[in-house]
Amino acid sequence: MAKAKFERTKPHVNIGTIGHVDHGKTTLTAAISKVLYDKYPDLNEKRDFASIDSAPEERQRGITINISHVEYQTEKRHYAHVDAPGHADYIKNMITGAAQMDGAILVVAATDGPMAQTREHVLLARQVGVPYLLVALNKSDMVDDEELLDLVEMEVRELLSSQGFDGDEAPVVRVSGLKALEGDPVWVKSVEDLMAAVDESVPDPVRDRDKPFLMPIEDVFTITGRGTVVTGRAERGTLAINSEVEIVGIRPVQKTTVTGIEMFHKQLDEAWAGENCGLLLRGLKRDDVERGQVVVKPGSITPHTDFEANVYILSKDEGGRHNPFYSNYRPQFYFRTTDVTGVITLPEGTEMVMPGDNTEMTVALIQPIAMEEGLGFAIREGGRTVGSGRVTKIIK
């Protein structure tokens, strides 16, 4: 049978299950998949628990992550759902941005309440910029006492509020993934209610095209008689011909006008997010711009050198370092298209960082980079990736 074409008729939303190990993330993922298949068989594929549970190994920037991707649809939306079974997998996935989430379902077992990993996942979700969390109080079939459920719900709401999410308003839905998988009508309805809450409460993502224009420069060359052309893949936004732009990063910010846009040697009136294109820049010489800078809508992004980050350091088995590093370690930080040297300061109380650890750190780059919170980077030594991270806070 021919593979069905991806229909762009509905909003597409990336979502995931997060929370403590053994609280039932994978079972709930399978239950959502089954319940929606039973309700809308023409919109969904049949997926069983085993196929989701055997999360295949992926390599993202050299980091090994076990992760399952499940697709499903409600009447309103098309969802891509990621489930990272292990605690370490989840942390690597969040920090490396292997799967960007527009919202996440925090799974908390009603029998246990929030645990240490629950807290860590919520904190990390906030740091890497997951915009919205809602809660599935799983295994609710195993708690007979209504008051106990109320208490757990209160605890979860407090946890969300303490990490900067809307703990008062976030939906908390009492579900049982296992009972829903078994077809128990009461708990099947609970999963339907959960997805109705996801449909209603997770905001439609802002599409890349609607954001301010940004294109990292990959190459610069001169076209005789026409001027300087920079090439790259537009990361976001749209750019019309004759627009003013800024060139940001590495050197002082420069203003110029885009007088021509080309793709595959064809002239275009507009460049769109996701397209590889060449931009002809008025009045700039080849030596005025370089790889590693970005072409942006004026005023939309600024250059910075000092920032805080959350970082995962590759283990030896992943091809990372063989020994720990300390404060004042000076590797290269690879942002978008270029390496910049930076000096690391570890947080108070952290003596050293071992391969395979995740840590927070402060970094001072020797050259400014166009930066905003949530931006991902790789840490490299001599061209080899030894870590991956995201900017959590800009200092200067």
From Swiss-Prot:
It is found in: Cytoplasm. Residues 19-26 are annotated as: G1. Residues 138-141 are annotated as: G4. GO terms for molecular function: GTP binding; GTPase activity; translation elongation factor activity. Residues 83-86 are annotated as: G3. It catalyses: GTP + H2O = GDP + phosphate + H(+). Mg(2+) binds at T26. Residues 10-206 form the tr-type G domain. GTP binds at residues 19-26, 83-87, 138-141. Residues 62-66 are annotated as: G2. One of its GO terms (cellular component) is cytosol. Gene3D superfamilies: P-loop containing nucleotide triphosphate hydrolases, Translation factors. InterPro entries: EF-Tu_GTP-bd (IPR041709), EF-Tu_GTPase (IPR050055), EFTu-like_2 (IPR004161), EFTU_2 (IPR033720), G_TR_CS (IPR031157), P-loop_NTPase (IPR027417), Small_GTP-bd (IPR005225), T_Tr_GTP-bd_dom (IPR000795). It is an enzyme of class 3 (hydrolase). Its EC number is 3.6.5.3. It comes from the Bacteria. Belongs to the TRAFAC class translation factor GTPase superfamily. Classic translation factor GTPase family. EF-Tu/EF-1A subfamily. Monomer. This is Elongation factor Tu. It comes from Pseudarthrobacter chlorophenolicus (strain ATCC 700700 / DSM 12829 / CIP 107037 / JCM 12360 / KCTC 9906 / NCIMB 13794 / A6) (Arthrobacter chlorophenolicus).
